[in-house]
Design a protein with these regions (language model features):
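Internal, hydrophobic cores of structured domains that mediate oligomerization or house catalytic pockets
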Residues: 1-75
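Aromatic/basic-lined ligand-recognition segments
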Residues: 48-169
Length: 169
């Protein structure tokens, strides 16, 4: 199995204008070089891809979804606080996204929010700059719009009065 493998192949690829095409090419290269692969570690997105999925995606005429280009991770801390963040966006020339101080009651909603916003950014590509434009990404059950604004963490950090980064002291 995968844990007993003695060889590994690393492919590093900076994605160009069309991130989905670049990712598809990366999967095709991995599948062609190692046709009997056990799996692919997508290091940028920090996730394992099953060999069967890689083979199907590489041989498909349909490009992978934008949701395949990144992952959303949740790190829980004290007081039920959860730090949510993406991995894989920077290879697409986009900023990684995060939500600080989510909580146990809302982290699933925040996971969906980050996922939808990341897909929105990737699908828009270079035509959209999240640092300048807001994005309407949906509507709540009560009819209120969901509008997302991306802010640099160096600015947004001041909105968290009691937040401590990097440890307890």
């Amino acid at each position: 199995g995968l844990l007993n493998a003695r060889l590994a192949l690393t492919i590093y690829m900076e994605f160009k204008k069309n991130a989905k095409k670049s990712y598809h090419l990366q999967l095709k290269i991995a599948n062609a070089i190692v046709p009997e692969l056990l799996g692919v570690l997508d290091e940028s997105a920090e996730r394992m891809l099953p060999a069967r999925w890689v083979n199907l995606a590489a041989n498909s005429k349909v490009l992978p979804s934008s949701k395949d280009l990144f992952s959303v991770q949740a790190v829980s801390g004290k007081n039920s606080k959860v730090w949510m963040h993406t991995h894989g966006m920077t290879r697409c020339h986009m900023t990684e996204l995060e939500i600080l101080e989510s909580d146990q009651a809302n982290y699933n909603n925040h996971f969906n929010l980050l996922s939808i916003y990341a897909m929105y950014c990737l699908d828009k590509g270079e035509a959209f700059d999240p640092r300048i434009e807001s994005a309407y990404i949906g509507q709540l059950i009560n009819g209120y719009p969901v509008v997302v604004t991306c802010r640099s963490w160096t600015e947004a950090i001041f909105e968290y009065k009691k937040l401590q980064l990097g440890g307890e002291k």
